[in-house]
Amino acid sequence: MAGDVEGFCSSIHDTSVSAGFRALYEEGLLLDVTLVIEDHQFQAHKALLATQSDYFRIMFTADMRERDQDKIHLKGLTATGFSHVLQFMYYGTIELSMNTVHEILQAAMYVQLIEVVKFCCSFLLAKICLENCAEIMRLLDDFGVNIEGVREKLDAFLLDNFVPLMSRPDFLSYLSFEKLMSYLDNDHLSRFPEIELYEAVQSWLRHDRRRWRHTDTIIQNIRFCLMTPSSVFEKVKTSEFYRYSRQLRYEVDQALNYFQNVHQQPLLDMKSSRIRSAKPQTTVFRGMIGHSMVNSKILLLKKPRVWWELEGPQVPLRPDCLAIVNNFVFLLGGEELGPDGEFHASSKVFRYDPRQNSWLRMADMSVPRSEFAVGVIGKFIYAVAGRTRDETFYSTERYDITNDKWEFVDPYPVNKYGHEGTVLNNKLFITGGITSSSTSKQVCVFDPSKEGTIEQRTRRTQVVTNCWENKSKMNYARCFHKMISYNGKLYVFGGVCVILRASFESQGCPSTEVYNPDTDQWTILASMPIGRSGHGVTVLDKQIMVLGGLCYNGHYSDSILTFDPDENKWKEDEYPRMPCKLDGLQVCNLHFPDYVLDEVRRCN
């Protein structure tokens, strides 16, 4: 019996200790310190203050003269603010209003009562509006509040309301040059057209003539190439700052040059032409619903996991290939409805600009092509092989973005269609496809550094240089598959294998393969849960997305599969289904300015 030990824990101990201190405080018993603030005296228990505040804990336990004093004078805070803070330390409750929060926050920061500081910040952020934003900024700055997340939430409000705030004199007065520069450099300002940001900057400069000395520096954070030419002529060149600022005149000249060189815009990649966008949107350019041709509409996968629709080129075009050059999209070839009412291979090329949500017709390819492959290397877009209704060919041509012209280059080694192309390490890899005899496992790489001379390219049908080089074949023959480069490797998904070309009898190829260029080897990975062809593919959040296509059960799909290359696993239903079942879709990730997305949101 004597050796038995049994432990007990009181469920009300913490509550009773707090209640005990409150009772002593209310009855005025054992109070051992008086705090003098302004003309007011506050009596309290040192032990209680030390448990609630790091400031008082150090004061009463460290070697400070106040440790043994019965009366302590505190300066730098108000009696009103401290009375609320003292009440919180005893009772755990506090009432805040816009009339008192200033003094309470001051007192809480003074005595290092972090919990009350957080309450004050949450209260202020919940109450923030255009009318009090400058006041709240000043309040947090005055007391050096740096609580995690507070500044981020304040900046988020400022960025969301930047233009209307810049019309308020109180905000213009308080906003510093340094803060203005940080906001103008932030991509979250994309909800406002660039001309509105420029006009906001003018308001800030005009508010105080002494600020004009910052004009040249500030102007460098305005992206004039994102404006329309009319805005630059009518609102920028006519302002007094255009005459005052050499930097502004330089930026305007750069923008006008950008507007004039329409075809070269994808190559003129500079800060002033870059979209303000924090995150790209998965974008689908659709071309077929079952066997029916549709206009090339654009679908956006937008949070919270919904699809939006934008307008596409006003021609019944099913683009077979897509190329991305610095956030410009080129849709090439495919099929279109001819004057005879039949579908024919197309040579048309369209360029999409998400900055203005606009389309531009570019120079046609030299020959109509469908079921071909493309790749972008430097300033060129390469189009490889393909077919028309009557002919399969091996010609290869490239589009020079600088002059909007096509020219033939060294042809592909064999006639082929239904193949896939992707650029890796500045080389264009072509995989699979259908030749004159069968579906192919072939992998061929095009190295532009080995291209023939102009004279050789002119005689393209007779001359084959060493531009094309065979690599290790895939494990499976396939056509109408998809390929994408990711982390220095090539991934191939799905497709079909044609067994009898005359009847186009085929079987599915659901396997996934990865190619390592360092070892020139293909490795088989996990197969797709539902095999398909004519699908789209892109990378999002370190996962490869496979969208739509024709499934092996004969049905067209609106589903999205995701593949994790690190875990070699497939998942379904990670993303919402597309609004329609699509075949022959082209997919990429694009940056859109928020003001374009806002307009799309209103239309959807």
Swiss-Prot record:
Pfam families cross-referenced by the UniProt entry: BACK, BTB, Kelch_1, Kelch_6
Localization: Nucleus
Pathways involved: Protein modification; protein ubiquitination
Organ and tissue specificity: Widely expressed at the mRNA level, with the highest levels in lung, muscle, and spleen.
Record domain BTB: where: 31-98
GO MF, any single term: ubiquitin-like ligase-substrate adaptor activity
Domain BACK: 133-237
Keyword Cell inner membrane: no
Family matches, as SMART domains: BACK, BTB, Kelch
Keyword Nucleus: yes
Keywords: Kelch repeat, Nucleus, Repeat, Ubl conjugation pathway
GO cellular component, one term: Cul3-RING ubiquitin ligase complex
GO biological process, one term: nuclear protein quality control by the ubiquitin-proteasome system
Renumbered ranges of Kelch repeats: 328-379, 381-426, 428-473, 489-542, 544-590
PANTHER family registered for this protein in UniProt: KELCH-LIKE PROTEIN 15 (PTHR45632:SF12), LD33804P (PTHR45632)
Stated role: Substrate-specific adapter for CUL3 E3 ubiquitin-protein ligase complex. Acts as an adapter for CUL3 to target the serine/threonine-protein phosphatase 2A (PP2A) subunit PPP2R5B for ubiquitination and subsequent proteasomal degradation, thus promoting exchange with other regulatory subunits and regulating PP2A holoenzyme composition. Acts as an adapter for CUL3 to target the DNA-end resection factor RBBP8/CtIP for ubiquitination and subsequent proteasomal degradation.
Quaternary structure, from the entry: Homodimer. Dimerization does not affect PPP2R5B-binding, but is required for its proteasomal degradation. Interacts with CUL3. Directly interacts with PPP2R5B; this interaction leads to PPP2R5B proteasomal degradation. Interacts with RBBP8/CtIP; this interaction leads to RBBP8 proteasomal degradation. Interacts with PACMP micropeptide; interaction prevents ubiquitination and degradation of RBBP8/CtIP.
Protein name from the UniProt record: Kelch-like protein 15
